[in-house]
Amino acid sequence: MTRIVGIRTLDETIHRMGGIGDNWYTTWAANDRLYTSLTDGTGFPDVEGYTGMFHNTRVFAINGNPPHHSFEYLHGFPDLPFGDVPEEKYRYYGFGIIALDDRLYHFLTTPNHPFEYEGSRFVGCKLVYSPDLGETWLNQDGSP
């Protein structure tokens, strides 16, 4: 068995793409594409489908190979609500994505109440999936 005994960062292989958001959990799918999810951001202003809308979670596809790769806005991913008042904010945060066969699974979590209030913490979870590599998304029970 081969063991990993260390890693090193190669700065010349890092490509900063300028997206607005954080976390960027990523998975490699059967169609040889990468899929990544952002939290707390608007995405990429130069990508088709960009609206400037703030998302707690949004999934993108990554096409091509570095340094000539690009991001794709997945129109089938639901625009999860994000309101202007605390009670309507912070609904679902995407904290993990994985590809298995021709499906994508995305883990979402939700807080007990808005973060403006003391004692806020993540208490709930939800699993959504795409049976067709990002074209459509369903709840874990198969409902839209």
What positions do the PLM features span?
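Beta-propeller domains
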Residues: 1-17, 27-88, 108-143
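Beta-propeller and closely related beta-sheet repeat lectin domains
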Residues: 22-24, 86-96
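Structural WD40 beta-propeller signal
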Residues: 29, 98-100
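Glycine-rich, often proline-containing surface loops adjacent to acidic residues and nearby aromatics
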Residues: 100-107
